[in-house]
């Protein structure tokens, strides 16, 4: 009986051993049928399963190729503004610099005939101012003469309308005279009044001199003066006996004309005496 039990146990152990050996064989064959040692491949698969788990840490290195910003460097060649430098040679204004040496020879030319030009200018001033005295300053002479007649209570007084016309004509002529020549013009007006009085004294030798109205006419601003052309003493200097009369009439003219016409008369006009018919700049 013992032997029978031992044999039965051995049979059971053998069957269990064969069943245990046969069970893993069909599991390993479908995975790798070509390999004859399936037991050695099991740890390899386990190792391969562990490596991909460990190798999955490397994918975070993939964003490095995404950081390539090299195409953004392409706009740098785009802002090249070299073509706008082309207009600089077009705007070269070098030819206008050529006229600068041209006026240089002109500077010594006006410096040479300075004395001749001054002489010519003085002659022209004398001629023009003498013409002004003969024609244009007659209204100023008559205005001052009217004030002189009023101051001396003369019966010969102009009408208001004709006196206003004389004032307008006188102021128009004074504005046309240069400022440096107005003093000489005032002196010539005073000389003309003195000559006018001298003519009246010659025509009326009596002690009482009556002032006659001037015979000049002023149609449309045109002035005609005949007494200065007929008088041979049109040019001359103030005589010593005429000096008080000259100073009186000059003061009257300097009080009347500048205020009436609102023009500037140099202050030295009240102290200097200019010869009649001679003009210049002081």
Swiss-Prot record:
Keywords, sorted A to Z: Allergen, Repeat, Seed storage protein, Signal, Storage protein
Any Pfam family hit: Gliadin
Post-translational modification, as annotated: Substrate of transglutaminase.
Region spans: Disordered: 27-122, 220-240
InterPro entries on file: Bifun_inhib/LTP/seed_sf (IPR036312), Bifunc_inhib/LTP/seed_store (IPR016140), Glia_glutenin (IPR001954)
Signal peptide coordinates: 1-20
Segments of skewed composition (Polar residues): 224-240
Biased composition (Pro residues): 60-111
Compositional bias segments (type: Low complexity): 27-59, 112-122
GO MF annotations, alphabetized: nutrient reservoir activity
Database matches in PANTHER family: ALPHA_BETA-GLIADIN MM1 (PTHR33454:SF7), PROLAMIN PPROL 14P (PTHR33454)
Function per UniProt: Gliadin is the major seed storage protein in wheat.
Similarity-based family: Belongs to the gliadin/glutenin family.
Miscellaneous information on this protein: The alpha/beta-gliadins can be divided into 5 homology classes. Sequence divergence between the classes is due to single base substitutions and to duplications or deletions within or near direct repeats. There are more than a 100 copies of the gene for alpha/beta-gliadin per haploid genome.
Protein name: Alpha/beta-gliadin A-III
UniProt source species: Triticum aestivum (Wheat)
